[in-house]
Amino acid sequence: DIDCKTVDSALSPCIPYLLGGGTPTTDCCKGVSAIKDMSTTTDNKRNACKCVKTAAARYPSLKDEVAQALPDKCQVKLDIPISRNTNCDAI
């Protein structure tokens, strides 16, 4: 089961990257990997997606295109879009 506290703490090292771009830190990429490892079922993916979306909404200056590029920059195949605008039920 995925809870948002876990997702938030996994993504917290990514906040400077998400707000400013550049290169994500190793800790940030470890967090992205951790979310991937938790997201093994459709329900888990949807829950993680909702947590990510809620977290993203707390940062009005978050750059959506930077957020969406995060899994690629970390070389993690994440099946969850990192965005404020995702329809999580469509996953």
From Swiss-Prot:
SUPFAM superfamilies tied to this protein: Bifunctional inhibitor/lipid-transfer protein/seed storage 2S albumin
Gene3D superfamilies reported for this sequence: Plant lipid-transfer and hydrophobic proteins (1.10.110.10)
GO biological process: lipid transport
Keyword Transport: yes
Tree of life domain: Eukaryota
Pfam families: Tryp_alpha_amyl
Molecular function via GO: lipid binding
Alphabetic keyword roster: Disulfide bond, Lipid-binding, Transport
InterPro entries: Bifun_inhib/LTP/seed_sf, Bifunc_inhib/LTP/seed_store, Plant_nsLTP
PANTHER family in alphabetical order: NON-SPECIFIC LIPID-TRANSFER PROTEIN 2-RELATED
Protein name, UniProt field: Non-specific lipid-transfer protein 1
Originating organism: Carum carvi
